[in-house]
Curated annotation (Swiss-Prot):
Reported phenotype of the disruption mutant: Does not produce lolitremanes but accumulates both simple and O-prenylated paspalanes.
Name of this chain's protein: Multi-functional prenyltransferase ltmE
Matches recorded under PANTHER family: INDOLE PRENYLTRANSFERASE TDIB, INDOLE PRENYLTRANSFERASE TDIB-RELATED
Record's cofactor remark: Binds 3 Mg(2+) ions per subunit.
């Protein structure tokens, strides 16, 4: 699929629509299009250039993550390119106007000066708080009106001057409307949950220190100099929340909404033409939509977004002006009402209980680090919070979708994590699904993913900022799903052709792409949350390579601040011609006080498994040559032959072992680059799809035991690892089409030495029958490593 946008300006126009002022032109000068089509076209292009360029710069200044519930242009293209394009568009339209109509060019330049003068005045107030703002009530209101007349009114006056060929007959009308438009914007920013959803932040103006109309009213009506002034000065979350409560008090809110209603009198036609239908509700104004005089339809009432949910999310996250879309109101789920939640049946939950609890229970016991009470707690958590979110059982009447968490289609992937002396812990990853997943209502299973993330982040007490940010960045909108769905096969085939260099690739049937995996590390009786996102969906719908898109996103993520590591990764992948190789994005989800140690991980693929490739990607082309990295490479070199199933060893570091053909979608290797806030040196982990280099699970088990012996781990004793797997998943010698093993990862750090993870793919039986292997929860089936 070809890119849908060429630059930040075109990207914004694609979101908002071309010729934004067309209805105004037709209302104020209905004959212009027929009488002077050239001037008509020029006026529309001038207004688009001025309006959209201002939006591009505003979004940068406000650090807005979203625009109309999609990533803002600077998030996608970067701040420098976005600002440069905005000014380039303005310069071009000025030059064009000077050539085609010098009279209009003069009006355009005058208006641009006034617009920027008003914006400058607003930014000075933002910088200085109340220090340079008038003290007297009437002077404060007059200052606000003057700023509004310049910043917003000049835009509409420009339209009138262009229509009147430099005349002033529309000035009074459009000055009034400019004030209305500014009031409307300021009120929506505080009082409209729908607007907050589209912008990805509640009360963005207040959090940025903007002296908007509700702030001015609060200063006048409530004499709230102390509370509001402190919020403007400190910009702290606590002070901002106190100020927001003042702005949302009935006295301030009703005064603002009454002023907005009064400003619209006599402008009804212009108000209707302007649109901006986000709803605002007042405690004393009968819930009317105060953005326009017409009545709210029942459909609009049904679509109303619960402000309390957004506020609760902001409170939980301590959100700043960059806080992003709450999971329950993220893209595409606006069509799913609460009654449309696709809960699965108790029969389905019972099926997953029978399938999953014995597997996790067996692995917990085999690790010998979990007490009986801890195992019971972990299994109870699994049953209460995970199993109801695995979707319908396979081939049941309501089954619509097969999980993409494993190659077998099983929706939960257990893994065993070994480190240091070989001590093992359990982890599992699952794809949230429900009975509507895969249907026309929710073909990509977005709703259960966002619902589960919200519930788990609240339950586990984690800071949701990164979750919200990446939902906004990577989860597709409804329109993007509709765009991608029929073209998915074409996109996937194009990816395979590019990565393999072959035209004869076969793309397996894939009705969708995954949007979210949830992982839980089991630490004693507690759980550590990680979340994975697929960047390929945005690559498919925007045409922006996954690496470029991801790096732009990471540079704007709140409380990350690691542009140096991001730049290093982007430069390295560009050198390797791998800008489309980013396959996964993962985040640690931790309590707010632990956020400085949280990781963001970027996963990339390679089409070679030679150790030369490993060395290049582990050192990022020689950029990371610290002692820990080099020691890790030495340790990995010692076990590399066993991970690739080469029992005789590998002499030539340039040797790349061919894949077995297990899956045409499988790459040779994966690497993850782990970045923490402020740390410029990423940790690098290599992932080996062992099922692509071995004939069967029996061989893989033997290779792992050789691997563990090389590291002097107790699981390397003959038959030990194999017994662990068989006690959980059944015989390693089987005739199924899919493997029990899903891959292995390897990383080395100075603190804990080698850290290796073994990923498992439980078999997916059809019809809900457990026919392949019957689990037993008696001690004889559990491998005891306590005396080894």
């Amino acid at each position: 699929m070809k890119p849908t946008t060429r630059c930040p300006f075109d990207y914004l126009v694609s979101q908002c629509g071309k010729h934004h002022f067309k209805t105004f032109v037709q209302l104020l000068s209905p004959l212009l299009q027929d009488e002077d089509p050239d001037r008509y076209a020029l006026i529309l292009d001038i207004m688009d250039a001025v309006h959209f360029s201002a939006i591009l710069i505003d979004d940068i200044a406000n650090q807005s993550a979203l625009r109309r519930n999609q990533p803002a242009a600077h998030v996608v293209f970067g701040e420098t390119e976005t600002a440069t394009r905005a000014y380039l568009v303005l310069l071009r339209v000025v030059n064009r106007t000077m050539r085609e109509n010098p009279v209009l060019a003069g009006e355009l330049l005058n208006s641009l000066e006034e617009i920027h003068q008003g914006q400058d005045e607003s930014l000075v107030w933002r910088r200085d708080g109340l220090e340079t703002f008038p003290v007297a009530d009437d002077e404060r209101l007059a200052a606000y009106v003057r700023m509004s007349r310049l910043k917003t009114g000049s835009l509409f006056v420009l339209l009138g001057r262009l229509l009147a060929n430099g005349g002033t007959e529309f000035d009074d009308l459009l000055v009034r409307f400019g004030l209305y438009a500014q009031l409307q914007h300021d009120c929506k920013n505080i009082y409209s949950p729908e607007y907050a959803l589209n912008k990805g932040s509640v009360a963005e103006d207040l959090r940025n220190g903007e002296l908007s109309y509700p702030v001015v009213v609060a200063l006048i009506e409530n004499k709230a100099e102390g509370i509001v002034g402190e919020a403007l000065r400190t910009r702290s979350d606590g002070d901002t929340e106190q100020a927001l409560r003042v702005l949302e008090s009935p006295a301030v809110k009703d005064a603002c909404l009454h002023a907005l209603e009064a400003a619209s009198v006599g402008l009804e036609d212009l108000v209707e033409a302007w649109g901006r239908r986000e709803k605002m509700r007042s405690d004393t104004l009968d819930g009317d939509d105060l953005t326009r005089p017409s009545t709210i339809t029942q459909h609009e009432q049904d679509d109303h977004v619960d402000r309390a949910a957004i506020d609760a999310k902001s409170d939980a996250s301590g959100s700043s002006n960059k806080s992003l879309t709450p999971p329950e109101t993220a893209p595409t789920t606006d069509t799913l009402s609460e009654t449309a939640v696709g809960d699965i049946s108790s029969v389905d939950v019972d099926y997953w209980t029978r399938r999953c609890v014995p597997i996790i229970g067996s692995l917990l016991k085999s690790c010998r680090v979990y007490s009986e009470a801890e195992r019971e707690t972990q299994l109870r958590f699994l049953q209460e919070h995970v199993l109801p979110n695995l979707g319908p059982r396979p081939s049941s009447p309501g089954s619509q979708i097969q999980s993409m968490a494993t190659f077998s289609g099983f929706p939960l992937q257990p893994s065993i994590n070994l480190s240091g002396s070989g001590q093992a812990k359990v982890r599992y990853t699952f794809e949230p699904l429900d009975s509507l997943s895969g249907t026309e209502v929710d073909p990509f299973a977005l709703a259960p993913a966002q619902r589960v993330l919200e519930k788990l982040s609240t339950l586990l007490g984690v800071w949701p900022g990164w979750i919200d940010a990446l939902i906004a960045a990577y989860h597709p909108t409804r329109e993007e799903v509709e765009q991608l769905h029929p073209n998915l096969h074409e996109y996937l085939r194009g990816v395979l052709v590019r990565t393999t260099g072959r035209q004869d690739v076969q793309v397996p049937p894939m009705p969708r792409m995954w949007v979210c995996f949830v992982a839980l590390d089991l630490e004693g009786a507690s759980q550590a949350l990680k979340v994975y996102f697929d960047p390929k969906i945005k690559e498919a719908v925007t045409g922006i390579p996954s690496c470029k898109y991801t790096c732009q996103i990471l540079r704007t993520v709140d409380r990350f601040g690691n542009a140096k590591a991001v730049d290093m990764l982007e430069q390295f992948l560009a050198e390797e011609h791998s800008i489309g190789a980013v396959e996964l994005i993962a985040i640690d989800c931790v309590p707010e006080e632990m956020q400085p140690s949280a990781r963001i991980k970027v996963y990339v693929h390679t089409m070679s498994n030679s150790f030369q490739t490993v060395r290049k990607y582990m050192t990022m082309g020689g950029r990371c040559m610290d002692p820990a990295t080099l020691e890790g490479l030495e340790n990995l070199h010692d076990v590399w032959y066993s991970l690739l199933g080469e029992s005789q060893g590998i002499v030539n570091e340039e040797y790349s072992k061919p894949l077995t053909g297990f899956s045409s979608m499988q790459h040779h290797l994966y690497f993850s680059y782990e970045m923490t806030p402020g740390n410029a040196d990423p940790g690098v982990k290599v992932y080996i799809p062992v099922q692509s280099y071995a004939p069967d699970d029996k061989t893989i088990a033997q290779n792992y035991e050789a691997n563990f012996r090389q590291l002097n781990w107790p699981w390397g004793e003959p038959g030990v690892y194999e017994a662990v797997i068989e006690s959980a998943l059944g015989p390693v010698k089987h005739s199924r089409a899919t493997f029990l093993h899903g891959g292995s990862s390897f990383i080395f750090s100075k603190g804990r030495g080698v850290y290796q993870s073994i990923y498992l793919d439980p078999p997916l039986e059809e019809g809900g029958n457990i026919a392949v292997f019957e689990h037993h929860d008696d001690q004889d089936t559990i491998v005891d490593l306590g005396n080894m």
